[in-house]
């Protein structure tokens, strides 16, 4: 199990080191438009899971949405502090 901050640190490191075969690197290379489409897709899956699936499945979908949001943040050069400032 990892925290939101730990995930962001891990993804930031992957963005920096660009390991071969990394899903994160592939998404970053695809660009903001492709990542944004994935965020929208995952948000819809969260909604559907919340409506029709178990808490476990909903939590899994939320974790995937958070992952893609963080990848989008990295693609835009945003830090956690940039977002926290608006919470």
From Swiss-Prot:
Keyword ATP-binding: yes
Family matches, as InterPro entries: HisE, PRib-ATP_PPHydrolase-like
Pfam families: PRA-PH
Keywords on record: Amino-acid biosynthesis, ATP-binding, Cytoplasm, Histidine biosynthesis, Hydrolase, Nucleotide-binding
Pathway in which the depicted protein is active: Amino-acid biosynthesis; L-histidine biosynthesis; L-histidine from 5-phospho-alpha-D-ribose 1-diphosphate: step 2/9
Keyword Electron transport in record: no
Documented EC number(s): 3.6.1.31
Family label: Belongs to the PRA-PH family.
Protein name: Phosphoribosyl-ATP pyrophosphatase
Organism: Thermobifida fusca (strain YX)
């Amino acid at each position: 199990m990892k925290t939101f901050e730990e995930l962001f640190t891990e993804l930031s490191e992957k963005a920096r080191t660009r390991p071969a075969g990394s899903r994160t690197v592939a998404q970053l290379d695809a660009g903001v438009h492709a990542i944004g489409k994935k965020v929208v897709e995952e948000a819809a899956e969260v909604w559907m899971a919340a409506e029709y699936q178990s808490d476990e499945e909903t939590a899994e979908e939320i974790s995937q949405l958070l992952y893609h949001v963080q990848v989008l943040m990295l693609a835009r050069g945003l830090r956690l502090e940039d977002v926290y400032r608006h919470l």
